Regions:
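Helix-to-loop junction immediately C-terminal to a conserved catalytic motif
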Residues: 55
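Conserved ABC ATPase "signature" region
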Residues: 71, 118-137
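Short coil-to-helix segment of the ABC ATPase nucleotide-binding domain corresponding to the Q-loop/switch region
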Residues: 100-108
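Conserved ABC ATPase signature
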Residues: 142-146, 150
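A short, proline-enriched helix->beta-strand linker immediately N-terminal to the Walker B motif
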Residues: 161-165
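Catalytic Walker B motif of ABC-type/P-loop ATPase nucleotide-binding domains
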Residues: 167-170
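Helix N-cap at the start of a conserved alpha-helix in ABC-type nucleotide-binding domains
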Residues: 178-180
Length: 250
């Protein structure tokens, strides 16, 4: 990361175990404000655990995670809830409410967390994010009428409507066809450009990694093995990185 940039996420000496299984082993990582970081690695190497610790869904055993200037582990429940409004989490499966229309799904977290907003302001913000994800015409449809790629974009829009400063994406293109994957990759890039958010993107998709990431982090066995640009990481002589590239490259 370039020196002198303001830090959005600062992770130092992070350890996490589940029983006898040590998932993270001394992870260090910085994410600058306005930077997209892609975290790559085999299944089970601790990638998803890492971002769940960042947003306070899990607690580390050792180490520190400072998000937007606050040590996550030490926050009270009220302060943690306030921080989570600034940290958007896009899960692998977009858990939309089937009985609600698209606009109602997106408005739900806004109305729950910002009760002072008028109905007119809520509708305005919902339409704005739908326009950002290029799905304004679906506002009155139900989730069952949407494709997998559209559901993923609506899930992202539901997070964006809260105007977060950080986005966490967990396998954003998993299960999508190539065209939908390209649309999601473009959306992630555009969100950074339009909203200036920082992001950690967990993925196995090398096309996603190359098109969305300012910097790549390669993890093996709970440790950051290599970080740098896409070219720097995959020109590495490390045999495990070569093997990962050969296995995942399409």
């Amino acid at each position: 990361m370039e020196t002198g940039k303001e830090i959005a996420i600062d992770i130092k000496g992070l350890y996490k175990s589940f029983g006898d299984n040590q998932v993270l082993r001394g992870v260090n990582l910085e994410v600058a404000k306005g930077e997209n970081i892609v975290v790559l690695g085999r299944s089970g190497t601790g990638k998803s655990v890492l971002i769940k610790i960042v947003c306070g869904l899990l607690t580390q055993d050792e180490g520190s995670v400072i998000v937007l200037g606050e040590e996550v582990k030490n926050l009270s429940t009220k302060r943690l809830e306030a921080l989570r409004l600034k940290v958007g989490f896009s899960f692998q499966l977009s858990a939309l409410y089937d009985s609600m229309t698209v606009k109602e799904n997106i408005a739900f977290p806004l109305m729950r967390n910002f009760t002072h907003l008028s109905k007119k302001e809520v509708a305005k913000r919902v339409d704005a994010v739908l326009d950002s994800v290029s799905l304004i015409k679906t506002r009155d449809q139900y989730p069952a009428e949407l494709s997998g790629g559209q559901k993923k974009r609506i899930g992202i829009a539901r997070t964006l409507v809260l105007r977060p400063e950080i986005m966490l994406y967990d396998e954003p293109t998993a299960g999508l066809d190539p065209i939908s994957s390209i649309e999601i990759n473009s959306l992630i890039h555009n969100i950074k450009e339009e909203f200036g958010v920082s992001a950690i993107i967990i993925t196995h998709d090398l096309v996603c990694a190359k098109t969305t990431g300012d910097r790549l982090v390669m993890m093996f066995d709970g440790v950051v093995q290599k970080e740098g640009s896409f070219e720097e990481v995959f020109n590495s002589e490390d045999e495990r990185i070569k093997s990962f590239y050969d296995y995942n490259f399409i």
